[in-house]
Design a protein with these regions (language model features):
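Charged boundary/loop elements
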Residues: 1-173
Length: 173
């Protein structure tokens, strides 16, 4: 149960997995839960932070993979950090947000720090008319879009011309 005395899948999962959380991880999880985000976005950000999405690098730990290259840019090993920050397709998605955001402006060397920087963005990241909540929601939408594109390529064998497709206007929230 969470603080309001109501049972939820999220609170049960949090309780059953509490032994795995570090103090810093607990703080991030608390910050995610305090945001006005759909649970799907919360879980996506949490999975990215903990590097537990089934990326090529993650799957290769469990079984031998034919390739672990990023399916979007095919230039580096597919990790959460690469897929959501360093991949050229991800950079284009971030920049096309309507705010012209450069994801490189977030100082993150791992996926946990990336999500931490999104949930608690540094002052230089937020613009005058953009609240923290708007920024986090935009970031969650962009990451969800990147994950969806990735899954279309990997799971549905779709051939996507990333230079020809317009990215969504994520600033309309």
């Amino acid at each position: 149960m969470h603080g309001k005395g109501k049972f939820s899948i999220r609170s049960a999962n949090g309780f059953s997995q509490s032994h795995r959380f570090t103090q810093e991880g607990e703080a991030l999880w608390g910050s995610l839960q305090n945001l006005e985000l759909h649970e799907r976005f919360e879980m996506l950000l949490w999975k990215i932070a903990n590097d537990i999405l089934l990326t090529g690098a993650r799957m290769n730990q469990k079984c031998e993979m034919e390739t672990t290259w990023c399916p979007l840019c095919e230039t580096e090993k597919e990790t959460c950090l690469h897929l959501f920050k360093n991949c050229s397709v991800a950079k284009a998605a971030w920049f096309s947000s309507g705010w012209g955001f450069f994801i490189e402006s977030l100082n993150a060397n791992n996926s946990f720090d990336l999500i931490k920087s999104i949930v608690s963005p540094p002052a230089h990241v937020l613009r005058e008319q953009v609240t923290k909540e708007q920024f986090v929601l935009m970031a969650a939408k962009i990451m969800d879009h990147i994950w969806s594109l990735r899954n279309q390529v990997v799971c549905e064998n779709k051939k996507i011309n990333f230079q020809a497709i317009p990215f969504q206007n994520f600033s309309e929230i």
